[in-house]
Structures are given as structure tokens and as C-alpha cells.
Amino acid sequence: MEMFERFNTLVGEVIGCNSHGCYVRDDETDKVVFYYGCGQRGDRVQLTVKKVNLETEQVTCVLDAVLSYAA
């Protein structure tokens, strides 16, 4: 989790969504992060890290760009 504090952007694939946002598996660390916003499973996205909670190991992000849409 400390790794997310050093980087402010990450790239990954959407693995699931709910009514609030989407869960993304980070390509570099293989960790799952959350962003508030719309998406679809399989989308490739770039995110900006907004908050890292080391106690609960939660990373909250915002969507920067959709790199590719799910097929």
C-alpha cells in the first residue's frame, strides 16, 4: 500500500462495478483499487490516487481517462 502513496497515477482493468463506482486491478501491483464513477467490466482505465488508508488498506481514486473500452 505504501507504493500507492509514492505514485499519483495508475493503469488497470475494471473488474467490477456497483452503484457508486468501479473496482480496478492495478497492472503494476496487482492490487484492487476503487474509483467513483461509471465504467464497465473489461475497460482499461488510468486513475489518479486521491486517498490511501494504510490501516484498512483501501485506495480511493478518480478516473483520468478510459484507455480502451470492453469488447
Model regions and ranges:
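Single-stranded RNA-binding regions, centering on S1/OB-family and related RNA-binding modules
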Residues: 1-71
